[in-house]
Design a protein with these regions (language model features):
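Short, basic/aromatic-enriched C-terminal tail that caps enzymatic domains
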Residues: 259-275
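Nucleotide/pyrophosphate-binding catalytic subdomain
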Residues: 1-255, 268
Length: 275
């Protein structure tokens, strides 16, 4: 029997998010595990039916690594970012814009696949010459996303960008792409799905989850080495989004079934809220 209390609890949140924009960075185990993937797709489909404008921004690190292995090419990283020479860039585009993007679109009844190149959605310059074809987003042109909303579609965006300082394209960190898009769209919420519970005082102890973190606390948390490694760029993306008008930013565990619905349509919340 359906628990009516659950539906009643969700009602004010449905009202709050109807006709609002939510940007979700989709990656990690939530993209690989078939059960988790199905749950995310169901969550996004339901949110769309409720009138929430959801954008999925995805990377595809594991799939890129797999394709590089097949071509006998080594995956190299610098400060957590993939060194993307011309050959690797071709593979990145093929995997992200082709395989990963189209597979996700195929699972969504109202999905429409886009890359950051389409409509010059993301315009970028070189981030670091040592990384070769890794870009820094200089401008976001969100009109193509707004057009898809008007027609009731769910945009699924791969994280590559049009180069403005050369001919060609750039590989973009998906967290950064999601953050910049959320800012440009004046999104109500940005959610980064990860493979950890959120920001924890002790990464090995999930009971130390920090459910709410103020932007003003971030420098001290870095100094105390609570924010380290791969969490640093995620937090920096969140801080920028908060400072530039995104109402709510969340880092949450993509391994939790239906975590998007729990976060958006209940009073429980998931992960770490940056405010």
């Amino acid at each position: 029997m359906i628990d009516a209390n659950v539906l009643v609890e969700a009602l004010p949140y449905v009202k709050e998010y109807t006709n609002q924009i939510v940007v979700v960075k989709y990656g990690g185990n939530a993209m690989i595990d078939e059960q988790l993937k199905a749950a995310v797709i169901k969550d996004v489909t339901l949110l769309n039916l409720l009138g929430v404008h959801v954008v999925l921004v995805h990377g595809g690190g594991p799939e890129i690594n797999e394709m590089l292995e097949k071509t006998n090419k080594e995956s190299k990283f610098l400060n957590g970012l993939r060194i993307t020479d011309d050959e690797t860039m071709d593979i990145v585009q093929m995997v992200l814009c082709g395989k990963v993007n189209k597979n996700l679109v195929n699972l969504l009844d109202k999905g429409i696949g886009l890359s950051g190149v389409d409509g010059s959605l993301f315009e970028a310059s070189c981030l670091d010459s040592d990384l070769v074809n890794v870009g820094k987003i200089e401008k976001v042109n969100p009109q193509i996303i707004l057009d898809t909303f008007e027609k009731g579609y769910i945009p699924v965006v791969s994280s590559v960008a049009k180069a403005i300082d050369k001919q060609g394209t750039y590989n973009i960190n998906a967290d950064l792409a999601a953050s910049e898009l959320a800012i440009a769209l004046h999104a109500k919420k940005l959610i980064l799905l990860t493979d950890v519970k959120g920001l924890m005082k002790d990464p090995k102890d999930e009971s130390t989850l920090m459910e709410r973190v103020k932007v003003s606390q971030i420098p001290l948390l870095k100094k105390e080495k609570i924010i380290t490694g791969g969490m640093i760029p995620k937090i920096e993306c969140c801080v920028k989004a908060c400072r530039e008008g995104v109402e709510s930013v969340n880092i949450q565990d993509g391994r939790v079934m239906h975590s998007l619905l729990v976060e958006l349509l209940s009073n429980q919340g998931v992960g770490t809220l940056i405010e």
